[in-house]
Amino acid sequence: MKLPKIPLILAIAISSVIPAILNSQSVTDLDGNIYQTVKIGDQTWMKQNLNTSQFRNGDLIPEVKTDVEWEKAGLEKKPAWCYYETNADNGKIYGKLYNWYAVHDSRGLAPKGWHIPSDMEWKALSTFLGGTDLAGKKLKEKGTTHWKTPNKEATNDSGFSGLPGGLNYSFGSFVHQGNVGYWWTSVEDSEETAILFSLSYENSTLADFFLNKGVGISVRCIKD
């Protein structure tokens, strides 16, 4: 039996809807936080920063509320998280800040089916978006609701919606919220440091460098 042909207009309509469906999936962590996802090239990323207080097995990640406790966690190489300036309202927008010991913990920081991206996965993302000098503008949320002016050239063409969550230094000092977004990779640079990627309000670059593992910064997850 001959199958009926799909009218061209209908075919176009269907094809335009499919990407939206693929990009509208979500994942939920053990705290009940729901993360929208976006497909960029061959990768699927969360559109929000991680905000869980539990490892994948249900164990609680210690919350740290003082400078002294934060520095101690880093020195003892123990996992920890905090809100920027210990203000839970910041978590609603920017997620939690984690030290690298939480990222690297064998109990798993990312939800099941997801993981913390390696530096090579970040670099693959950058390459797909046109390289280091162009990727940043395509990854940053548009406008200055959360980013400091001028949030240079931000288009968010990728749908990644990168936010400037700032950081908590290993000795316990909050800086750069509104100015810079930092995200851990799963890869260490040395015994004391690990690799991260960053976006800035001042340029359109996706930069990579390293910081002390006791620093608290944002985390984005990528699908297995």
Regions found by a protein language model. Give the residues of each.
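Conserved positions within compact, well-structured domain cores
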Residues: 3, 23-224
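Bacterial Sec-dependent N-terminal signal peptides
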Residues: 1-25
